[in-house]
Amino acid sequence: MTAVVNGNSKRYSWWWDSHISPKNSKWLQENLTDMDSKVKQMIKVIEEDADSFARRAEMYYKKRPELMKLVEEFYRAYRALAERYDHATGVIRHAQQTMAEAFPNQDPMMFGEESPLGSSTDGFDPQTPDSYPPIRAPVYPDDLRKGAFGISSSHLSTVKRNIAFMEDPQSVSSGKGFKTAKARKGLNFNNVDGKEINAKVLSESERASKAEAEIVALKDALSKVQAEKEASLAQFDQNLEKLSNLESEVSRAQEDSRVLIERATRAEAEVETLRESLSKVEVEKESSLLQYQQCLQNIADLEDRISLAQKEAGEVDERANRAEAETLALKQSLVSSETDKEAALVQYQQCLKTISNLEERLHKAEEDSRLTNQRAENAEGEVESLKQKVSKLIEENEAYELQYQQCLDTIADLKLKLFHAQEETQRLSREIEDGVAKLKFAEEKCVVLERSNQNLHSELDGLLEKLGNQSHELTEKQKELGRLWTCVQEENLRFMEAETAFQTLQQLHSQSQEELSTLALELQNRSQILKDMEARNNGLQEEVQEAKDQSKSLNELNLSSAASIKSLQEEVSKLRETIQKLEAEVELRVDQRNALQQEIYCLKEELSQIGKKHQSMVEQVELVGLHPESFGSSVKELQEENSKLKEIRERESIEKTALIEKLEMMEKLVQKNLLLENSISDLNAELETIRGKLKTLEEASMSLAEEKSGLHSEKDMLISRLQSATENSKKLSEENMVLENSLFNANVELEELKSKLKSLEESCHLLNDDKTTLTSERESLLSHIDTMRKRIEDLEKEHAELKVKVLELATERESSLQKIEELGVSLNAKDCEYASFVQFSESRMNGMESTIHHLQDENQCRVREYQVELDRAHDAHIEIIVLQKCLQDWLEKSSSLIAENQDIKEASKLLEKLVSELEEENIGKQVQIDSSINCIKILRTGIYQVLMKLEIIPGIGSGDENSRDQRNMHDILNRLEDMQTMLLSIRDENQHSAIENLVLIEFLRQLKSEAVGIETEKKILEEELESQCQQLSFSRDETQKLIFVNGELTTKVNQGVNREKVLMVEIEDFHRQVLQLRDDYTILQGDNNKTLDEKAYLTKSTLQLEEEKCKLEDDISLLLSETIYQSNLIILLEDVILEKLSGAMKLNEDLDRLSIVKCKLEEEVRELGDKLKSADIANFQLQVVLEKSNAELLSARSANVHLEHEIANVKVQKEKELLEAMLMISIMQNEKSELSKAVEGLECRYKEAKAIEEDRDKQVLRLRGDYDEQVKKNSHSNEANLKLEADLMNLLMELEEIKVEKENLNQELFTERNEIELWESQSATLFGELQISAVHETLLEGLTNELVEACKNLESRSTLKDREIEQLKGRVNNLEDANKGQNDLMCKYAQAIFLLKESIQSLEKHAMLHEFENGPATETASLVDNSDGFLEIQELHLRIKAIEEAITKKLAMEELKTSSARRSRRRNGSLRKQNHEIYSEETEMITKDIVLDQVSDCSSYGISTRDILKIEDDHSLEAKSQNPPKGKSLSEESLVVDKLEISDRFTDPNKDANKRKVLERLNSDLQKLSNLHVAVEDLKIKVETEEKDEKGKENEYETIKGQINEAEEALEKLLSINRKLVTKVQNGFERSDGSKSSMDLDENESSRRRRISEQARRGSEKIGRLQLEIQRLQFLLLKLEGDREDRAKAKISDSKTRILLRDYIYSGVRGERRKRIKKRFAFCGCVQPPPSP
């Protein structure tokens, strides 16, 4: 039973996994992934944030439908999961019931919460269903038949039904067929009845499960919706409470402000009563006392107002804090909603866990099948009712969400109101400061009056006492105010700042009193001076009275204008928002300008790097024909111009700041004018006259606004022209880039040809070495002389063919150089044309500058008039200043770019001259080579004479002259040796015949081994010759291809030249216009002294530029400067446009304020009720109009955004179309026509502007007359006001009470009036803005396209310029390499002469033996260091003659000395030893030559040949030190091939040869590693520089850096390994020399040598891999330089990789060849020594 119980623990896990596990159910997996994605989208939408609450509300309303959609989809997915879960649980319950009936003896498995313990009897965890064994594992048919469990047949039928019910066909087919087949086999007693019952049970269970799943899902949905409803209701209630709290707080704050205002009015009344009492006491002293009282009154009023303003500011701060707290609460609510969602996800996971727990309870499923029909029907009804409820709840939820949104709207409105209140407080504080300034001015006048009073000296003391009493009274009142302040401080701690301000005012008052006392003392001392001032006293008293009147009117206006200030502040806030939007657009433009400036900065850095090389090229500049002194002076002059222009720019910035301060003063004056108009409006008689004047002013302002719009349009046209000019310059730069690319390709081709020439030269050297080895072998092997001669002749023919090919390549190189020179001539012609163009453009720019200066003077005059009259014409002056800055920036940048361009040109010229100088050096070296050839001819004649003396017939063959010389020398040596051998044979025939036979046998063995080695080497040589022939054919094909490409490039260059000519003709028209503007600018400069100096400097610069026509100024510099200037001008003009718009808005605001003041005064006196009705109607109409205007503005802004996106897309597309120059030509033509049209339009607009300015002047004169009339009327009214002061005081008291009553009404009307005023002001501004925006859109569309194209042209030009510079550098490097190659050839010729000299010395030793016996051999000096090589060759010729004489003497002596055979034999043995020593020295020199040949392969890696020579010298010295003292003959060394046939005495040469080979390999590896180290350092520098320039590709450069560091580490490891191997080889071979006797030690040494050679071979392979890796990194760097340079850089990278791979591929072959060559040590460059007998 335990087995059955264990099987029950997870009996239906297979079915449960198919319904629940996401791995087995694709539907579940997709549903879960969909839910996850929806949740992430919802979180993303909720997490979005904004700067302000209003923005957040807008975002919420925009994202609300998206959120609703996501929530609905999430709910649907969750509902589907719930239905699936309910279906599964229902099936499980039915299965549990049927199993309980089938197996009553078993313990029933509890389902859901029915299990008290929650675990099965077998100890398995119910929460881990996957860990149980399969359900049907223990159920087998044999067990069932045996009745092991005691189950009856009825029970078995029920079991069979249960199993049939549980066996889904899908599960059977899913991999459990074996066990299910067993179960069916054991339980299939009644198949037919079981199947029918199972089908019914399945259908009924499915219906019931579906219905129950729907019920459960709907219940869950209802519970969730209700929970959400409750949460939303709670949030709604909270928000309502917060709103009510805010409203109550606002009302409290308003009440507090009212109470404070009432207290302030009471305090003012008390101050006025005090003033009246003081006036009664001081009737006798009316003038001075009245003035002082008024000052005190003004101070008190201002203090009260300051306190009120500070209180209001504190209240506003409190409101702002509360609003911020509300926003935080809302954020917290959002966070809580997110946590609720997370909790829902957690609950879902818990549901999944409970689903896994319910797997164990699958035994009660059959009983529920009977009741499924009834439940299904009931469930369907419940489902329908629940669906209706759910829909209702969803609707209620939506309604609550709408209410929540309304609450958010109200909160946003309250925040806006708080913001407006803050602005009002700031405005009031500013007005109070203005009042304080006026009071100070009045106090100064009072001081002057007190000085003028002579008779009041004695009375001043009494007045001071009275003033003290008054100050005591004021201090008492101030104490009362202090008490009030303490009350306010208890309410809000922020009013402390107001108290400190009040105390500072008191201190100022006390200071003024002290100053009065000091002034009184001064009056006593200066009484005589004041007598003369009595006449002026009366006038000053009148002025003081006027100031009193003004102060009173200002006090009244401060109270009455509070409401108007609030409305104006609201307008100002809206205008500020519009200004912020415009500033954002301006920032975008500024970013574009900064991007262009960064690109220009990059170009400047590159040009500065080129300029660093200028110092080294000054001497070469003199060779070219340029004068460096004049060039430096011109550069200095341009720098001085640049500095002066910078100073001008700084001055203009200072002027701009001054103008901004003037603008602020203008705003203050405008406010003062408004206050004055309000004071004048109190007089009913003067109101009508002022209304007429206001109408005229409104008309004038409208005309001014129209004029400004016209000026804006004119500026836009100017901007379009400037942009077209930038595009022209960019097109020219692109064409120059094409030319530079062509030059660069030509240089690359030349480099390839040079590299091929080097390879061919190396191959020639190798062939020469092969020839020498073959001749030496011919001497040793007399039997193979004929065959070897034939092969040598073939090799000589091939060598001649190679020379012919080399000459052909040289002619091709000369033709390519001629083509390059032709291109340089064409560029010079272009530069000449450009010089004329520069002069023309400068004259035109002078005209533009003169016109601009003229306009500046006119605008300055107007500004002065308006400052005196109305101070409203400052915008024109600002525009002129902006234009001056633009021009100055343009001049600075143009001068800097001209200087840079000149530097580049001079560098290019210097490089070309360097090329020519290098060619001349090559020619000189060729002459030296010819002289050396002549010397060799002289030596040949001497050798021929020696042959004739020796009676040797010279060889007449078809080979080369070098081979003939070698043959002749060999014949001479052979003849001499034959003579010696003949003598020895005659002397020793009888005595040593046996010894000679043994020697001959050994010699024959050696000859056999040598013959075998020679045959193998011949085969290898034949294969190498074939490979070289293939390489030559490949190089021919490449040269033909390069010639074809060069022809195509020349055609392209010619086409570019023609295009440039056409563009130059088109550009000349544009520069004429620029010259006209410059003339106008010079006219304006004549007005000012500073501008006169600048004009003189500019004229000097223009004259210098005209003198420098022949110095080839480049087209691109001016065009680049013009484009940069125009881009800056566009940005500055846009700033000017924005400032103009702001000025127009300010004018409209001024007019609106005047109209508002009129309407308010009329409404307060006459028609309050009628105004409310009309305000409602007008408000509705204006709302409609404003909605339309807002819609239009939104559409315009969206259009602008769309245009910006289109501009970005166009940029991306245009970058791919840089090389389409034909399209650019057509665009240039269109731009030319547009520029001409724009110039005409500008001229017409300029005339219109002049007419408008004349009308404006007339209007100014009219206003001046009106103003004079007003002044007169004001003087009369002021006299009347003096009489009516007492009456006005009483009336003011009554008016204050009336105003208190009216304020309640005004507060209700404020909101509506503010809205009406806002609509009126905004409608007027918006309609104007719409018209302007329509014009701007049309202009900006064209301008943006033109700017994009211009920017691309500039970039392409800059890249082409860089390429040209790089090409010239490469060209110079190639010529330097060629020069070095010629130097190497000369060194080799010198070495050949040196070897000839040594061979002659050996001849002398053979010929004149007695001289060598008498004294040691003197060492000969090398010809490498001797400058006069011809004399050395003559000396050699004389020595050859001496050898002839010596030989003749020797023959005569031999005939006489036949008797002394043994003695001569010993002498000959000593001579042989000397020959061996000489031979060893010669082999060392030959290895040195071979190492030099080997090093020449490394030239492609960037190491100079001088350094390589130094390295090889060091290696040669080491090799000399390491060689054993005893030399080896060639025959001994050639025996290394077959070790078995070599005797013990030839082991030492084999070891030395192995050692030499290993050392040569290690030395070559070391050289390669040093070259790779230099390449890695260059890559590091290049990566760092390019990473600084390109900031968008840091990741790619970091990866490359990492790879470079890895390569560097590998290099260091290989270097250390190489050093260790070198030390091992040296130490190991030295040890081997001492252990020759024992064979065991020899075997160990040979194994160790093999290991060392194997390690060396592996090291060379690793070095090869490292070379490929570094080449790959170089290719990556070339690839990262940009998409624009893909073609050119692809060619560069291909050429570089070809060269480097070729060197790498053939390096091994050449190294092996050199090793084989080094085996055969040549006696000299052309002679092989004889083998030792």
UniProtKB/Swiss-Prot annotation:
Keyword Methyltransferase: no
Family statement: Belongs to the NET family.
Region (Disordered) residue spans: 1456-1476, 1628-1656
GO-annotated cellular components: membrane
Encoding gene per record: NET1D
Keywords of this entry: Coiled coil
Job description of the protein: Plant-specific actin binding protein. May be part of a membrane-cytoskeletal adapter complex.
Coiled coil: 195-816, 897-931, 960-1043, 1196-1386, 1553-1627, 1653-1686
InterPro entries linked: NAB, NET_actin-binding_domain
Protein's UniProt name: Protein NETWORKED 1D
A GO MF label: actin binding
Residues of the NAB domain: 12-92
A Pfam family that the UniProt record links to this protein: KIP1
Compositionally biased intervals (Basic residues): 1460-1470
